[in-house]
Every structure is written in C-alpha cells, then in structure tokens.
A protein has these predicted regions:
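C-terminal edge and immediately downstream basic/flexible tail or linker adjoining helix-turn-helix-like DNA-binding
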Residues: 2-8, 19, 123, 128-131, ...
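Short helix-capping/turn signature of helix-turn-helix
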Residues: 34-37, 45-48, 145-152
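Arg/Lys-rich amphipathic alpha helix in sigma70-family domain 2
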Residues: 66-73, 83-103, 122, 174
Length: 192
C-alpha cells in the first residue's frame, strides 16, 4: 500500500533525524541520499548553472547539518532543506542581478525569439519554454520554476521563499500571463 510506504519513509526520516541529533553523523547520509537530486534541481532552477547548483546543494546540506539542533522533531526534513537551498540560491542571484541587468538592458526578450518559424520538435519547444521562463523577472522565474517545473504547492513555495501564499499566487499569475504572451505561437494565441 502506498500509504504504508509513505509512513515507513517518514519513520525512517524521523529516525535518521533523531540519530543525527544524537551525534550519529552517518545517519545524515540517509537524508542527503533521499533529497540531494531534488535539492540540486531546485538550486539549478534558480541559478541555471550545474556547477553552482551542486555547490549550493552541498552548502545547503552542510548548513542544515550544522543547524540540526534547531530543527523541530516531527517536522518533515524536505521543506526545511528546500527553504535553505532556495534562500542560498536567491542570495547568489542577488549578486548576479546587477550584471544580468546590464547585459540585458535595452533588449526585450520577445525580440530575440524567432516567431516566424514554429519549433519543429519537442526539444525545441522545451527549449523555447525554458527560454521564456528564464526571461521572467527573478521572483516570477523562481516561483514559476518551483511550481510549474518542480511541482511544489503554493504553501511550500511560500515557506521556501518567506513570501505569503497570496504573493506566490500573484507572481505565478503574472508569470503565466507573460509565458502565454511569449509562447502564443505554440499554444494558440493569447485570447484566454
């Protein structure tokens, strides 16, 4: 039964957390193994660089390990580690923002795309979608990636970013509107 499997996973996670809090450093390996791919994916979705995403994931796990005494027992580890890596990734992006703004000044993202020819393959469509998401303002881009690509719920994204659920919904709504406009040739226009 899926519910039993989930309860078993939750119990293993709780045991690992208790063991780490009790001084067993090896128990932390379970948490790293369970969450590393998704943590790296969250980081990559924000910083868009594989090496940086790997560094940020490692930094997030180190930071979480060093702060385990403050972690509330009985709470799931996932949202906590995702919040840590999101905050670290956003910090990296804040430092990059001024350079990116200078690089993109005066150019409209829509002007760079070739709207005369439709993408021929699924990978080209995926690349167009990825490019459209990348062109969004930072918080819209982060929220869109976490919701649309990573599949996090509004409340989870709110927890990770320290924004309200209403703000998350607003960023997501604006992002969707801009994506519909940029991808109108793929998805049938902007008459929605």
């Amino acid at each position: 039964m899926p519910d039993e499997a989930i309860r078993h996973e939750d119990a293993l996670e709780s045991q690992a957390i208790a063991a780490v809090k009790g001084g067993d450093r090896n128990a932390y390996d379970y948490l790293v193994t369970k969450y590393m791919k998704r943590v790296m994916s969250v980081a990559w979705g924000i910083v868009r660089n594989a090496a940086d995403a790997e560094d940020l994931a490692q930094e997030a796990f180190v930071k979480a390990f060093q702060s385990m005494d403050r972690f509330r027992s009985g709470e799931p580890f996932g949202p906590w580690i995702f919040r840590i890596v999101t905050n670290l990734s956003l910090d990296v992006m804040k430092h990059r923002t001024k350079f990116r703004d200078e690089e993109l000044s005066g150019d409209e993202p829509a002007a760079r795309r070739d709207s005369a020819s439709l993408p021929a393959t699924t990978s080209e469509i995926g690349a167009r979608i990825d490019q459209a998401i990348e062109s969004l303002p930072q918080m819209q881009r982060v929220v869109a990636r976490l919701f649309l690509v990573e599949g996090f719920e509004h409340f989870e994204i709110a927890s990770m970013t320290a924004l309200s659920e209403g703000t998350i919904r607003s960023h997501l709504s604006l992002a969707r509107k801009k994506l519909r406009e940029q991808l109108a040739d793929i998805y049938g226009g902007d008459d929605e």
